Amino acid sequence: MRAIISLLLISAMVFSMIEAVPLEEGLQLFEGERGCLPRNKFCNPSSGPRCCSGLTCKELNIWASKCL
């Protein structure tokens, strides 16, 4: 019985820590991960076929194979 209560308390503590980060901040962190990589001017591979235009990512068209 004590083990179950301890497990519930630990679960509640972990959940409250996860909820401590606001959703908007979490989304901003995720968007930042998809930003431009400075060393090769390409976006993160997880963002798909995109390249950098300034500091933002743009879609590559069928004729473009690299960023200019």
Curated annotation (Swiss-Prot):
Keywords of the record: Disulfide bond, Knottin, Neurotoxin, Secreted, Signal, Toxin
GO MF terms held by the record: toxin activity
Cited Pfam families: Toxin_7
UniProt propeptide residues: 21-34
GO CC field: extracellular region
Entry's localization field: Secreted
Residues of the signal peptide: 1-20
Tissue: Expressed by the venom gland.
Main location group: secreted
Disulphide-bridged cysteine pairs: C36-C52, C43-C57, C51-C67
The keyword Secreted belongs to this UniProt entry's keyword annotation: yes
Calcium found in the keyword field: no
Record remark: domains: The presence of a 'disulfide through disulfide knot' structurally defines this protein as a knottin.
Role this protein plays: Insect active toxin causing rapid but reversible paralysis in crickets. No activity shown in mammals. Does not show effect on mammalian voltage-gated calcium channels.
Family, per entry: Belongs to the neurotoxin 01 (U2-agtx) family.
Protein name from the UniProt record: U2-agatoxin-Ao1x
Organism encoding this protein: Agelena orientalis (Funnel-web spider)
